[in-house]
Design a protein with these regions (language model features):
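Noncatalytic, solvent-exposed loop/strand surfaces
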Residues: 1-412
Length: 412
């Protein structure tokens, strides 16, 4: 919120330099060959020298320098996310909020050293007329802006696949429920920076955009993901469900941490090629009709309402229930770290733990077996997705604005 990027000494935490941008920076900067690249809410991309924070170049990605009031600050009509995607020597950024607003979302591929435009594109609309072309029910052909992701030679913005030259790639809509084959990549249906944990939104590492379908029973799906070359690690918060919505009850089973092979894909029961689903989560009951009859979540009755949604045909590699509200997660070579407030429920102060007033817990887990290796406490919880690892050290950004460094066993 202070529009500021800080460089700290990794060993002692001393501030080495700081740089103030023209708008807030909503996600971590990108380091590339001695440069610090980041976007900001004033519609610009900035490049600094990593050694001393000196400005190398600045690029206006917004089509005009026009400002509006947004989220208690003055921002560009076309903001730029903080994290910049660098692929094959090109820095990719977007400027804009939605393909349906203000002329759409501008796309740029820039030369990191100079800011020179290498590629450019535009995602705009589509704007349908009432008497014109109609879209498949539950499929939204437009998109909101998000941090860019690179996978398999493509650039992705949520459900929008792009070529490295920033040309949009057509996707196949698979059913009237709005599922689409968008290509394998990590995405969030509400945006990778959304930490609100609305119960019908999901992070997924999948080929499919879920559309109308719920994904609370799917593999490689949860409220936060980490993936390496072979395995995806996920946090599942809403593992119960009534008819329409996934549910969670604080202070009961805890939060589910689990692992899947990257080759395990979600499936819809009954579609061509699907296999019998694995029942792996606590199943919920719900009232059907107006009577007292109760049927299980796996019932065919779901076919007439919200349906089961995506399921799995192969079991998870491992599952671990933890009494920790996991808000941050990072994997090193041989340890998976998760951190967050304890899963406590006090009837007198029901939101105390969730709001961070009960401290936090950091847990180390074996990525191979799912066994807990160790744990420690933190005075303050991390911000959402606010933990990284560097050689021999673990860094966390906390909700009180501080940064902590936890040394590894070999560090002093």
């Amino acid at each position: 919120d202070a529009h500021t990027v800080h460089a700290l000494d990794a060993a002692g935490g001393k501030e080495l330099w700081r740089f103030t941008a023209g708008g807030r920076v909503d996600s971590p900067p990108t380091l590339h060959e001695g440069l610090v690249l980041f976007g900001s809410m004033d519609g610009r991309v900035t490049c600094l020298r990593a050694t001393d924070g000196e400005l190398v170049w600045r690029f206006l990605a917004a089509p005009h320098d026009r400002r509006i009031g947004a989220f208690d600050q003055i921002e560009s009509v076309w903001p730029v996310h903080g994290s910049v995607l660098v692929r094959a020597g090109v820095a990719y950024v977007t400027a804009g909020r939605s393909t349906y607003m203000d002329g759409g979302i501008r796309l740029y591929g820039l030369e990191p050293a100079t800011g020179r435009i290498v590629h450019r594109g535009l995602l705009e609309g589509p704007h349908r007329r009432i008497d014109g072309q109609r879209d498949v029910a539950f499929y939204v052909p437009g998109a909101n802006s998000d941090v860019l992701v690179g996978e398999g030679g493509r650039i992705y913005m949520r459900q929008k696949p792009l070529t490295p030259e920033l040309k949009e790639i057509d996707t196949e809509v698979l059913s009237s429920k709005g599922e689409a084959d968008v290509g394998l990549h990590v995405f969030s249906t509400s945006g990778l920076l959304d930490g609100s944990w609305y119960n019908r939104t999901f992070w997924m590492y999948s080929k499919r955009w879920p559309g109308f379908q719920l994904a609370n029973q799917a593999p490689k799906t949860g409220q936060l993901l980490v993936a390496d070359e072979q395995t995806t690690y996920a946090v599942r918060v809403f593992y119960r469900r009534n008819v329409h919505s996934p549910m969670f009850f604080p202070g009961r089973e805890g939060y589910l941490l689990f692992a899947d092979r990257n080759t395990t894909e979600p499936q819809i029961v009954g579609e061509a090629g699907s296999r019998p689903p694995v029942q792996w989560l606590p199943q919920s009951d719900y009232a059907r009709g107006r009577g007292d009859q109760m049927v299980k979540l796996g019932s065919k009755a779901f076919g007439g309402d919200k349906m089961i949604g995506y399921t799995r045909a192969d079991p998870a590699l491992w599952m671990l229930w933890l009494p920790v509200r996991i808000r941050a997660m990072v994997k090193t070579r041989d340890v998976l770290f998760v951190a967050g407030p304890p899963d406590l429920y006090d009837p007198k102060e029901p939101f105390a733990a969730i709001e961070g007033r009960k401290g936090a817990v950091l847990v180390a887990v074996s990525p191979q077996t799912g066994q807990e290796i160790g744990r420690t406490t933190l005075d303050v919880p991390p911000v959402f997705d606010g933990m990284i690892a560097a050689p021999g050290r673990l860094f966390a950004s906390l909700i009180d604005g501080t940064v902590v460094c936890l040394p590894g066993r070999s560090q002093p």
